Amino acid sequence: MERRKIMKITINYGKRLGKINKFWAKCVGSCHATTALREDWRKQLKKCRDELGFEYIRFHGWLNDDMSVCFRNDDGLLSFSFFNIDSIIDFLLEIGMKPFIELSFMPEALASGTKTVFHYKGNITPPKSYEEWGQLIEELARHLISRYGKNEVREWFFEVWNEPNLKDFFWAGTMEEYFKLYKYAAFAIKKVDSELRVGGPATAIDAWIPELKDFCTKNGVPIDFISTHQYPTDLAFSTSSNMEEAMAKAKRGELAERVKKALEEAYPLPVYYTEWNNSPSPRDPYHDIPYDAAFIVKTIIDIIDLPLGCYSYWTFTDIFEECGQSSLPFHGGFGLLNIHGIPKPSYRAFQILDKLNGERIEIEFEDKSPTIDCIAVQNEREIILVISNHNVPLSPIDTENIKVVLKGIENCREVFVERIDEYNANPKRVWLEMGSPAYLNREQIEELIKASELKKEKVSWGIVNNNEITFDLSVLPHSVVAVTIKNG
């Protein structure tokens, strides 16, 4: 692809389009519950909370046997222990976060079969007794309210299971059996407190939304929100080459179309996307490079005006055990941070998105490139312009030269850019230059953290007239550029 024309972006300062809803910072994902007992996991989550503003966290396996939640005594009666759950929630509250509790997987004491998923062997079978399943959920809800109080727990979310539409992967039962599982969990939660929030179906590919709504309506089953997941492709454990081919077949911007459809199907219930990423593979090289940053920013810009409850990125860390814990610093993991806590380009994308405080302002385009997306916001001190240059893999994309015109500004003090691209905020590039060491020492970790940082680059601007300035930008393929214009 070759574009000879210079693209022009005109920002109309003062023409406000409304406040930004930071739904992407409402929640973030992680692996399974026991990793939340690790000190390094906790340190990384606190960093994300402090720097990216995430409010909730969601992960699998609150009820797994490795959490020691549910046992059957010698007399056949059930026994419960919420000690590990308390440890996790205590920590979350301590750092100013809250849990988005996914009710999974099935404790062995309740399970009807032995089918499991992942390296940590979460049981995916329906319960032998739905009454006992309801008993477990009720006991959990009662304990949480007893420990943390109604007002606190009412701010949390209870989501029933994970991707039950992926037959024999996450759920060994039928859709009807999932609805029964949901019904018993929802009634158990509402029995404890009618104001606790419960929802589902937590499906892959935006599935089962009208079906669950219809089931709940016809059967008088409580439901407070719809949750679902989306990825441009659903080849979760394919080879990297197959994954690239599948990603290349995805339609650019298709996630936004699917979000709109989900909102229509769920109405009037709110929609919470509790997983999304550029692919569902935990070994996808694109997760580690600037491509992912451009994809993230482009996707958020596409859906910025939609009334989402949350859009929870999967995941914040590469401390992740679904396929076993990889020791490679850059192994294509989902995380915003790698196993050592080194920020990837995706992390820096969220850091740039966190700058979008204030109100959106109008942008006009001339000779717009089909791979460019951008958003501008203003507040009392500055204007922020964020640009993504993104296309799906193996598709045309080029460096874009852009002239920016800012109209209506009375006092410009400074303009600077921060970049995420092949040469900036790209620690994997430096790791490859090191020779791709499998195990990093302290000095290498520090060097890679430094390589990951956003760097401020001053931009020269020209004054067109008293209320108008202009400057030029170059935006590399699969990159993000954030421009800050200081005016106060």
Swiss-Prot record:
> Keyword annotations for this protein?
Carbohydrate metabolism, Glycosidase, Hydrolase, Polysaccharide degradation, Xylan degradation
Q: Which positions form S-S bridges?
A: none
**EC number per UniProt:** 3.2.1.37
Q: Which GO terms describe its molecular function?
A: xylan 1,4-beta-xylosidase activity
GO terms under biological process: xylan catabolic process
Is the S-adenosyl-L-methionine keyword given for this protein? Answer: no
Database matches in PROSITE patterns: GLYCOSYL_HYDROL_F39
Instruction: Report which reactions are catalysed by this protein.
Output: Hydrolysis of (1->4)-beta-D-xylans, to remove successive D-xylose residues from the non-reducing termini
Active-site residues annotated for this sequence: E163, E275
Similarity-based family: Belongs to the glycosyl hydrolase 39 family.
Question: What is the stated purpose of this protein?
Answer: Beta-xylosidase is an intracellular xylan-degrading enzyme.
Q: Which protein is depicted?
A: Beta-xylosidase
